[in-house]
Every structure is written in C-alpha cells, then in structure tokens.
C-alpha cells in the first residue's frame, strides 16, 4: 500500500512525475514551474515547500523545493523515491567555488560528493561510502552544457553540515581537487543508491570563496537558469 500523503508532502500517489527537478528555495521551484512547465498543477504546499507537476516538451515532469541542508533534502527525496515512485531526481542549486577555474555563473556538475555529514551512519556500513551521481545523467548533463555553450566543470563537491563554521578547511578540500561547496548532494545520492534510483546535482556558482565575488539573493532566485536549461534537457 502506498503511504501517501506523507508527513511532509501532501500529494496523492500519481500526482508526482517519475522525474523531479528540485531546488532548495521553493520560490525557485515556483519560478521553474512558471518558466518551463506547460499546464503546471500544484501538488504540495506543506510547510511552504511548493511542488508542481506539468509537462515540458510533451514529457511529464515535476518541480519541487527541498529546503536547506542534508536533513531537509534527505527527508523529501526519501519520501519521493520510496512512497511516490519517483525514479530520477535532479537538484539544481547554488554553490561556492573553491576552484581557481570556476567563476560566478559557471556550472558545477557534481560527479561525487565529499561530506562531513554522518548521514551514511544509518546504513551501518563497515567502511566509508562514496556518494556519486548516476553516470548516464552526469554524462548527458555535460554534453548538454557543452551544446548550450555554458561554462562548466564536472567533479567533486564538498557538502557541509554547517553554513557558518569556525574553520571550513576549504584549502584542504581544494588541494584534493574539490570544485565547490554546497549542502545537499550526499543525502540525495545516498537515497538514490539505497532505493535503486537515479540522481544528479547541477549547481551554479553563486560566490567564489577564493576571490570574494558574490551574488544577491534575488539573483540566485531568478537568474540562475543555465543549470535549469541543462536539467530540463535531460528529460
């Protein structure tokens, strides 16, 4: 029996498409629905976490917010994969560059996600798990970014449990070739792996931690559309 609605998603089973494109900010999800979806229908507003289902170029797709941080995206993506029959989740969001080769507005396609989170402890694994994206989604995203002519890099991100921290150790992650910092990818990738489904994170560089270059909240909400173009091209 399908356990829907869930405590955090008010939709009935069947109201959410098999592919969901997610953003941390629910207003960004609303913007995606207005910009990319034909005939969008809202399926969720529980806790203000807006979700919509419609079509894009004739293909059914949903968009939804996931909030900030690993615990929040962990809850929403677990419910989507395990209770709503979702097969593919693509997160589009912002990240901070710790690479000399990435500027504000560039894309990061997260092939893997390093983390200081204990999210994997729930699985009681006899070692350290390496959260990675689905290869096919990752490959096609890189091909799409190339076709669009967008500046992008494919590689590892570091996903932190803390936004404000006493010592971020960004130099150490940079020395390991990590491209950028965000806060959600490992939970999404682990939930996808555990449920036998697919996931990908595509981020836009909102600030460069090395140079201090940054963007406004309004810019992050409304103007980071290149990553969305890539995400919707994967349908």
Model-inferred region functions:
Residues 140-148, 191, 230-234:
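Generic non-transmembrane alpha-helical segments
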Residues 26, 96, 158-162, 187, ...:
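Glycine-rich beta-alpha junction loops
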Residues 209-235:
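His/Asp/Glu-rich mid-to-C-terminal helical/loop segments that flank catalytic regions of hydrolases
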Residues 1-129, 135-139:
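Metabolite-binding pocket within alpha/beta catalytic cores that recognizes anionic/polar moieties
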Residues 168-206:
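A C-terminal functional module that forms or caps the active site or interfaces directly
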Residues 116-119, 165-167, 208-212:
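Short acidic/His/Gly/Ser-rich catalytic and metal-binding motifs that mark active-site loops
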Residues 127-177:
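Active-site rim beta-loop-alpha module in soluble metabolic enzymes
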Residues 82, 169-170, 194, 202, ...:
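Expand to "…catalyze enediolate/carbanion chemistry for C-C bond making/breaking, isomerization
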């Amino acid at each position: 029996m399908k356990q829907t609605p869930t405590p955090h998603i008010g939709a009935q089973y069947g109201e959410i498409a098999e592919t969901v494109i997610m953003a941390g900010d629910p207003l960004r999800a609303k913007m995606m629905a207005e910009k990319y979806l034909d005939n969008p229908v809202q399926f969720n507003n529980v806790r203000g976490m807006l979700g919509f289902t419609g079509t894009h170029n004739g293909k059914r797709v949903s968009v939804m917010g996931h909030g900030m941080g690993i615990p929040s995206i962990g809850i929403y993506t677990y419910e989507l994969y395990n209770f709503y029959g979702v097969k593919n989740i693509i997160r589009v969001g912002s990240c901070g560059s710790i690479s000399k080769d990435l500027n504000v507005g560039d894309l990061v396609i997260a092939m893997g996600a390093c983390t200081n989170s204990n999210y994997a402890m729930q699985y009681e694994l006899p070692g350290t798990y390496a959260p990675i994206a689905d290869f096919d989604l990752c490959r096609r995203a890189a091909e799409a970014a190339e076709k669009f002519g967008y500046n992008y890099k494919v590689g590892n991100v570091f996903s932190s449990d803390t936004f404000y921290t006493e010592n971020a150790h960004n130099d150490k992650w940079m020395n390991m070739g990590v491209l950028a910092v965000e806060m959600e990818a490992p939970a999404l990738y682990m939930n996808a792996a555990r449920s036998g489904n697919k996931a990908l994170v595509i981020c836009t560089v909102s600030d460069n931690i090395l140079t201090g270059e940054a963007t406004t909240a309004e810019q992050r909400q409304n103007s980071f559309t290149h990553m969305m173009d890539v995400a919707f091209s994967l349908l």
